[in-house]
Amino acid sequence: MNISDRLEQTLLRPDSMEEEVRLACMGAKSHNLAALALPPVWARFAAIALAGSPVRLDVLVGYPLGTHTPSVKGLEARLALEEGAAEITFVPNLAAYKTGYRETFSQDVAYTLKQCRLVNPDAVVKVLLYLDLLSQA
């Protein structure tokens, strides 16, 4: 079994430059990684750089804290998929969950997933939870 095809590389710094993203794409391809996770601003560039390789582009939505409204997350996800992302990892509204607004939390997740499915029914959609934030009172 080759573990590298199960690994995902990330480059999520807000000050990442084009050359760093290009090198991350090249590295993900040369190491046969499963995916490369990037902010939405790099979706189109990375999709072109990764074209023809098995490396999937994973774009983070609502990152880093999940405080975007569902409509903003939905738009981010749709645009990322339209620009070539194969996966979406999104951060839900944990503040809503922690303060007892479970319906708001559920709607946030459901809306983002629905928007992804409208563009690409086969896209992998993942939820990123900061568990340490859940345990803080």
What are these regions (language model features)?
Residues 82-83, 93:
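A structural-propensity feature for long, helix-poor, extended segments
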Residues 1-74, 82:
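Conserved N-terminal beta1-alpha1 strand-loop-helix module at the mouth
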Residues 20-24, 76-80, 105-115:
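A general structural detector for well-ordered alpha-helical segments in enzyme core domains, enriched
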Residues 66-67, 94-99:
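A short acidic, helix-capping loop that chelates divalent metal ions and anchors anionic groups
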Residues 40, 44-65, 102-137:
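Alpha-helix-loop-beta-strand connector modules within alpha/beta enzyme cores
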